[in-house]
Amino acid sequence: MEFLKFLLLYKSTKKTKEKGAYIMNSFLDNFFKLKENDTNVKTEFIAGITTFMTMAYILIVNPSILSAAGMDSGAVFTATALSSIIATLIMGLYAKLPFAQAPGMGLNAFFAYTVVLSMGYSYQFALTAVLLEGLIFILLTIFNVREAIVDSIPTNIKKAISVGIGLLIALLGLEGAGIVVHPKDGGTIVALGNITSGAGLLAIIGIVITGILVARKVKGALFLGMLITAVIGIPMGVVDLPNKIVSMPPSISSTFMQFEWHNIFSLDMVIVLFTLLFMDMFDTIGTLVGVATKANMLDKDGKVPNIKKALFADAIATTVGACLGTSTVSTFVESASGVAEGGRTGLTAVSTAFMFFLALFLSPIFGIITPAVTASALVIVGLFMIETIKEINLEDYTEAIPAFLTIIMMPFSYSISDGIVFGVVSYILLKLFAGKSKEISMTTIVVAAVFVLKFVFIK
């Protein structure tokens, strides 16, 4: 009798769980339009974890860089995680796009090494500049200025951006693992690092394993590749197991709302602000356009869906990040890894945000995600990103040359924004002197003029 009661209770509980799962899946499907985007909850979740794993390094690197500016590294760690959570949630729930956000590399270096250490200002001054940048971006987004800039980029260059980002991502992966290094003797720009032992060897093993998984069309190949690589790295001595699992996040009291207002009308503030605006705007635009192009998310007019919401999410993210106490928050190029795993909606971003939340309390565990582990995913994603080169018009040299400059300048200058600058400016010059000036839009000319002014007077 008791056994029958148990069976009935088990059956009832199972039905309740199944019903609950069905309701949840239906809600997620309706909210994020999963079926419409040819994806599902499992795919989005794996994509979100993959994105997190390829960008988790920011939790370690950002505090290290900003501590050089006199900021408490523990507080910056918490601010980095919190700003990434909030920013990525906004991108996922509001813009409903699979892009993750966190304090941007390059932007944090400018914050610490240029504004604070070189120019001699306090980190409070730098945080004030970041706050003003975010507020200006909010206004520019409301009045459709940033959206107009995105639309002004020629179609061929948009496709080239995806290819250039692919090469840059691959370079980041190879460099992080020590496969590609900067030689101390200065004989060459880059050289081959140590690939017979340590991180370099582990990264190569990871690339081969991930490549096999991709070739065999294994679902979640990038995620599984990193997981297997991390396990192999333990006996190799490259990946260290943590001494503890749980740790409470440090306080952000020393960085929260730390602003300095008495220098906001100085010439230096104008220069710093313009540089931040320029770097963040075109890094973000390049990432959104490049990754969306690879994911076939562009509409028939070549526009990114919900681009205004995505740009607004980016602007809010920078503002929130400044209040918490970190440098400019931007859309991460590593979002391409999640897209490569099939992520197509905001549920991917929500999953990434959840992983950042876990990282707040489980930071020792996430310490095993070393550059040698993530290199495999970044290199393979680089391959995926360059596939759009097949769609670039190489017959018309006024289209092909700007596209080529966009592609090669991203990895060579280590900058997405600089690649876009070379592409757009050369596009206008070639069209103008080839007698094709009618193909140039006025907005594109204005954007190019801003590029030139920036490089003449600031860089």
Map each language-model feature to its residues:
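Short, Lys/Arg-enriched N-terminal segments with co-localized hydrophobic residues
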Residues: F3-I23
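Helix-loop-helix hairpins and the membrane-proximal interhelical loops
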Residues: M24-A75, V190-L192, L224-K308, A449-L453
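Helix-loop-helix junctions within the multi-pass membrane cores of secondary transporters/permeases
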Residues: N25-N62, S83, G104-Y113, L117-S162, ...
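Helix-coil boundary and interhelical linker segments in multi-pass alpha-helical membrane proteins
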Residues: S64-A75, V115-F125, M269-V270, T370, ...
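Loop-to-helix transition at the N-terminal end of transmembrane alpha-helices
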Residues: A69-L89
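Juxtamembrane transmembrane-helix boundary signature
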Residues: I85-M105, I136
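Membrane-embedded alpha-helical modules
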Residues: M119-V231, P235, V350-K459
